[in-house]
Amino acid sequence: MNNFYLEIPSIKRKEDIIDYINELEQYNSEINGIELLAKILDGYSFEETLENCLKRSNKEYAIKNGKNQVNTYLLIRKSDNKIVGAINIRLNYGSGINKFNGNIGYGIRPTERRKGYNKINLYLGLLEAEKLGLEKVTLACESTNIASIKIIESLGGILNYSEIDPSDGNLTNIYIINVKETINKYKNI
């Protein structure tokens, strides 16, 4: 875990972020953890998406605009300074948290998968969630996503219930993680 850290997106990472998003698109991969910045795929400029991303991480802005606060982070590998993943933490101040999204969304770029990085990504995200005052978080994943299920459960996630997501018709598992308990129990991952 000491080989990775989370970083708030910035203009200095513009090319790296665009490369990360393009890789997700190239592999037809779901865009998780970096949705606000992925608006570049809809024709918005990087600068516009970055500005919106940073605004959405501000509690006052979220409350004023009736939106959820969304804090987005990039998972950086220290050895080569490469973005290998992303995670966002959603706090409810306005429109409510969609139970099929949960408090946390996260993902790893396709060329870096199956290396154990997403467990580190989620753990570091839980550290940020604790700083934001979250005691428990909900995470959602499709019931067929075995990799995500294993990651969530390996960090103490407890299946709360499963339900059909009306947006896509897929059975979705909703998990709860006790933030402090998980941080203390798994700090040596």
Regions found by a protein language model. Name each.
Residues 140-141, 156-174:
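Conserved catalytic-core motifs of GNAT/GCN5-like acyltransferases
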Residues 1-103, 168-189:
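GNAT-family acyltransferases
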Residues 81, 116, 145:
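Conserved G/P- and acidic residue-centered "switch" motifs that form tight phosphate/ATP-binding loops
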Residues 16, 121, 147:
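Charged catalytic carboxylate motif
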